[in-house]
């Protein structure tokens, strides 16, 4: 399945859902990875240090509540909240951030 396009996969998924009587809800994923699913604030992208340079990572961080996660995970959380009104599980905002992570203001200054 790793060689098929997203459109083909969605078609396959819709057919399987129809076969088993599962309702499919499609939504617009635009901007779902920049809003904190925990408090609703705008997220900032974290940076990693590599060879004296700050490179963008996939981690998104909320300076208001301390939530952080991979940007794809953030998008999934926000889509679940949008369509169900439920948060998938409690964020672990008190866990330590990965070693070598640099916050945006540290990377730019």
Curated annotation (Swiss-Prot):
Binding site for Zn(2+): 36, 39, 62, 65
One GO MF term attached to the UniProt entry: metal ion binding
Pfam families registered for this protein in UniProt: Cas12f1-like_TNB
Record key words, sorted: DNA recombination, DNA-binding, Metal-binding, Transposable element, Transposition, Zinc
Keyword Cell membrane carried by entry: no
GO terms classed as biological process: DNA recombination; transposition
Family stated for the protein in its record: Belongs to the transposase 35 family.
Protein's UniProt name: Putative transposase MJ0856.1
UniProt source species: Methanocaldococcus jannaschii (strain ATCC 43067 / DSM 2661 / JAL-1 / JCM 10045 / NBRC 100440) (Methanococcus jannaschii)
């Amino acid at each position: 399945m790793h060689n098929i396009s997203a459109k083909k996969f969605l078609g396959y998924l819709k057919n399987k859902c129809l076969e088993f009587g599962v309702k499919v809800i499609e939504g617009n994923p635009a901007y779902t990875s920049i809003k904190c699913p925990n408090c609703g604030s705008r997220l900032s992208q974290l940076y990693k240090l590599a060879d004296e340079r700050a490179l963008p990572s996939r981690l998104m961080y909320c300076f208001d509540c301390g939530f952080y996660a991979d940007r794809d995970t953030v998008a999934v959380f926000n889509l679940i909240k949008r369509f169900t009104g439920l948060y998938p599980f409690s964020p672990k905002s008190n866990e330590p951030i990965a070693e070598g992570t640099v916050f945006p203001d540290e990377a730019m200054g």
